Amino acid sequence: MYILDTGARFSAVRFSPVFNPPPTSLRRRYFIVRANLPFPKHQAKYHKELEVAIDAVDRACRLCVDVKRSLFSSKEKIVEKNDQTPVTIADFGVQALVSLELSKLFPSIPLVAEEDSHFVRANNLVSSVVSEVKSKASIGDNHLSDADVLEAIDRGGKDAYTFCNKPATYWVLDPIDGTRGFLKGDEALYVVGLALVVDNEIVLGVMGCPNWPGDSSDGSTGTLMLSHIGCGTWTKKLQNVSGNVAGDWIRCFVDACVLMNKARFCIQESQTWESLPLSGFFDASTVSEDLKHKEILLLPTCCGSLCKYLMVASGRASVFLLRAKTQRTIKSWDHAVGIICVHEAGGKVTDWEGDEINLEEDQSERRLIFPAGGVVVSNGSLHNQILEMISSASPTL
């Protein structure tokens, strides 16, 4: 294992400065959370599942905030997994916490998630993870044992469930998408993402982004985004420093941009604009004030994929382009919740050939997706233009 430098620099989306709450612990203040929905329950077939998902993601975001503070104050270990991606006790704590919350009301629905308990055990992180989970779990869970928490983590692991090539209902969780952003600091984004899939259709999703720019006047920072099939996409502030849920749900939509040179683009931080097919048509600039005729605006948005989906679904960005690399796999949890949030906000998500993302291609595990060429996430209005440009540029790629 390697210890990562928590001071490593990564590019971040340029928002107004985020309010930094005082170091007052948010522990135990989660109890007042109420998963009220912004639409009538009878309109949402999966409203019970959605209410639980909202509450679980909100609790998970509180765990992230506390762990992040303790990481930098106590210099706890940050280890690397075999693929050289960083992982912290927050990743495992979130997975355990969400798994426990979901299993209380929906024990028969399997969970597909990123982590398993191997790294917790191997790096002596068990007691730290258990402590964080106990502090955020539902009332009555303060007697959780180490075995309970480790089992909850492994419930989402690779070997927990086999789908036998049949349509299924299951949760998809990314405990922290953008761990590098979690480690970087206040400007970088990271997301807790949870979706429910029923017979290969994503029917609901909840994303929590603790670093999303908030309102300094009330001490709030972060956002929750929910989507339910047929009910739209909605956002709400996370709890503020006093533990109150700030504000009401607000429905959000993709932007209305119809001109490619006026669009705002996001790309994966590990990829360059020059590696993407649209670079043959437009140059890219990160400076909005002086764009030339053949330039598009590129928004430096770190870290992970889900924050880019959040940008498009909320109308802050027009397009997110991801190129599939032959040497790397694309994980379902990096996209599932983002797909429904963008769809319900009026946008569109396909592979580079215009086909919808198929979550069942990995028939036995549902952990991988195989989008042809890559993923296009757009406001819908620009989608066909982008696909045409990709198609015309493909012989030269």
UniProtKB/Swiss-Prot annotation:
Q: Which InterPro entries match?
A: Inositol_monoP_metal-BS (IPR020583), Inositol_monoP_superfamily (IPR051090), Inositol_monophosphatase-like (IPR000760)
> Keywords, A to Z?
Hydrolase, Magnesium, Metal-binding, Mitochondrion, Transit peptide
Binding locations of Mg(2+) 1: 114, 174, 176
Q: Which PROSITE patterns match?
A: IMP_1 (PS00629)
Membrane-spanning parts: none
Fetch the PANTHER family from UniProt: PAP-SPECIFIC PHOSPHATASE, MITOCHONDRIAL-RELATED (PTHR43200:SF4), PHOSPHATASE (PTHR43200)
- According to its UniProt entry, what is the function of this protein? Phosphatase that converts adenosine 3'-phosphate 5'-phosphosulfate (PAPS) to adenosine 5'-phosphosulfate (APS) and 3'(2')-phosphoadenosine 5'-phosphate (PAP) to AMP.
In Swiss-Prot or TrEMBL terms, this protein is called Putative 3'(2'),5'-bisphosphate nucleotidase, mitochondrial
